[in-house]
Amino acid sequence: FKTIKFDSPSLGKPLPEYLILIKTKNHLARIMHIEPSVKRGDEIHLGDEIGRFINNGYFFFWVDAGMHVEVRDLNDYLRARGGYELMPMFASKITEERPVSELKGTVIDASKRNITVKLNKNNVVKIKDNYSLMDCATSLGYGGVLGKFNPEDEIYFNGIKIGKIDRIGNYMSTFKTEKLKVLVNGIGFRGISFIFGREIAKLLPKRYGKPALKKGDKVNIKLKRQEK
């Protein structure tokens, strides 16, 4: 249907952003953060390559490249808001995840941006008597959980309070995080990022550069609430 190129927030050098619009009947797939290899009028099929991932001024240095996808009406693709809400389908119920005595893991990837760790537990959180999955980068100050909960409900991960519910959607809730210290093998990190439904986390360094850990390292992770 169309591709659009425009400027992203500046990081001291020209960093373009791209908008790819793919038409299907009466709707558009709106895709950002991909430099297109397709052009207007190309026919796209499931599995086709459409471009390459980019990093620009919309990304913190510790964020890996990724794309943003929305489903929009044909004539409503430039506004920041307006995408259709997508409802997730669950294959099974989220069940209790018992706390582990120590949060441990193994480094499976290390880059100048972040360090990926395979954990010894899932990212299941406890909210009162319920259990949910979270998506959260602690350094951003907010996160999300699947399910509708009540404002001010407290969220616990591995027995540690990490935040409170502040907004409720149709199938999810967002929460404000506590101020947390992240220590890994005694090394301080900016934060930790969890991924929905996986025993995977990313350690977010305080600055871009040579990683403090390497692939294969065994780690002990401590999350501590900062004193106010």
Predicted features along the sequence, with ranges:
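Contiguous, well-folded functional domains in the mature portion of proteins
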Residues: 1-228
